[in-house]
A protein has these predicted regions:
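Small-residue hinge/turn detector
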Residues: 145-154
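Active-site acidic Asp-centered loop
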Residues: 154, 159-160
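Glycosyltransferase-associated regions of secretory-pathway enzymes
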Residues: 1-143, 161-309
Length: 309
């Protein structure tokens, strides 16, 4: 199982991510054995639902534009946005392969952001920069704010650096006013239904503006995340507050996009690879892997060595 290859963030990282209060609450809810709900995944959804109720009051800020946010003048419009803070040359090899796949399968202009060129496109409010420098806003949270603001101002497609493409992005997505992948849990009312790892929006889109405003309002008033999937909570709340917007989003199930990452440690099979590519051309991977996954003959090794197309 791929879960065996994930690198754990440890207790120090857990507290740094959530803050002491949120870490204690989340840890107690998720891991105390006396909990009535024994299934971990169900318990996680219940925690996310609880977190969602804490975020919902911030919807009142969805029409309040962000102060201190600015953009240098340039002629950028509707590009693909990718961010790796230290530059792609310093990224793990799997990140580099993901970037190469986007270049191969995209006709849009691709803007590869890093900490050196970020100010050429966006300048975040001073309170955000201070909280980031103090370690209160994690890099993932910082990137969330960045993606929402960039998409609202310039439009385009945000693709996480861990996304691997095997086909061009469908026109149905590129022609939509707003798009997000859907995390389907069948009959469960999923509080993190819409993830942030692949988003598309037209310049000035109202939905992405509301998402941006709610996200910045949260960080104006908080110093830690209440839930790691905070952006998913915000996107889901905003989208569900407008049924017509949700109805217009082209349907794409994340189950298919998250299948390749589950078999990276498996023995490579051309038949299975062709099947995976038929399911979807957009694959969400991860760089948080143990070196043990680099065994010969695996899907991971084939991907890294460019031996699969």
């Amino acid at each position: 199982m791929l879960n065996d290859y994930y690198q754990n963030i440890g207790m120090k990282g857990f507290i740094q991510r959530y803050g002491i209060v949120n870490a204690v609450k989340r840890g107690a809810f998720m891991f105390i054995k006396l909990h009535l709900v024994k299934d971990y995944e169900v318990r996680k959804v219940l925690w996310q639902e609880r977190a969602s109720t804490k975020i919902k009051p911030y919807l009142k800020y969805k029409d309040t534009d962000v102060e201190g946010l600015s953009f240098p003048e340039n002629d950028v419009e509707n590009p693909i946005w990718i961010y790796w803070n230290k530059g792609i040359e310093q990224a793990p090899i799997i990140i580099q392969k993901c970037y190469e796949s986007v270049c191969k399968h995209s006709n849009q202009k691709i803007i590869l952001l890093n900490d050196q060129n970020l100010a050429d496109y966006i300048r975040l409010p001073e309170y955000i920069e201070k909280k980031k420098d103090a370690g209160q806003i994690p890099m993932a949270g910082y990137a969330d704010l960045m993606r929402f603001a960039l998409l609202e101002h310039y439009g385009g497609t945000w693709i996480d650096s861990t996304v691997y493409l095997t086909d061009p992005i469908p026109d149905m997505i590129l022609n939509s006013d707003f798009f997000a992948v859907r995390n389907s849990l069948l009959l469960i009312d999923n509080p993190v239904l819409y993830p942030a790892w692949f988003l598309h929006a037209k310049k000035g889109n109202k939905t992405i503006r509301e998402i941006r405003n709610v996200a910045f309002a949260y960080w104006l008033k908080n110093e830690h995340v209440i839930e790691y999937l905070l952006p998913n909570l915000i996107i889901t709340l905003v989208v569900k507050s407008n049924p017509e917007v949700e109805k217009a989003i082209p349907y794409m199930n994340s189950d298919y996009s998250e299948y390749l990452v589950k078999v990276l440690a498996d023995d490579y099979s051309e038949e299975k690879w062709n099947w995976i590519k038929k399911l979807t051309g957009i694959h969400k991977l991860t760089y948080k892997l143990s070196p043990d996954i680099e065994a010969e003959g695996t899907f991971y090794k084939a991907l890294i060595e460019n031996s699969i197309e």
